[in-house]
Amino acid sequence: MIITIGGLAGTGTTTVARILSERMGIPCVSAGDVFRQMAAERELDILEFSRIAEENPEIDIEIDRRQARLADEHEDLILEGRLSAHFARADLKVLLIAPFDVRAQRISVRESKDIETVREEIRIRERSEAQRYREIHGIDVDDLEVYDIVINTNRFDAEAS
């Protein structure tokens, strides 16, 4: 079974993907894993590669291609990433959501950052990503039609999600 798990930062995608992987006994690959692999292939650290990726849409496109290829090569796999459901063949496509303030609080705790700083960073990142995804892929991130299930993780802790 191929499962994609997507969602905005702070919704719990990485945590849920990891827990599902452990409980189902199937591998999990995140878009972040693919990004780190691509940086290593170029012998760049993550920060350097991130700067390059901001200016080069081909990097986003390659991440999507690699995740789609992984889905084609495996019978059982969990793919975690914001756009995984749009590009990978999957039996189940899940979107996790949570209110803005809940996500900001989770990220603030996780990264030990001031909540107001996190809120501003989220706003900037989400505007930037929405624009990039629309320009590069023609994807409207607010269109949920591609997903089979949408789960609000607001009331769940990591294990319950």
UniProtKB/Swiss-Prot annotation:
Biological processes, Gene Ontology terms: pyrimidine nucleotide metabolic process
MF-aspect GO terms: ATP binding; CMP kinase activity; dCMP kinase activity
Keyword field: ATP-binding, Cytoplasm, Kinase, Nucleotide-binding, Transferase
Compartment(s): Cytoplasm
Binding positions (ATP): G7, L8, A9, G10, T11, G12, T13, T14, T15
GO CC terms: cytoplasm
Catalysis performed (reactions): CMP + ATP = CDP + ADP; dCMP + ATP = dCDP + ADP
UniProt record similarity statement: Belongs to the cytidylate kinase family. Type 2 subfamily.
Protein name: Cytidylate kinase
Organism in which the protein naturally occurs: Methanothermobacter thermautotrophicus (strain ATCC 29096 / DSM 1053 / JCM 10044 / NBRC 100330 / Delta H)
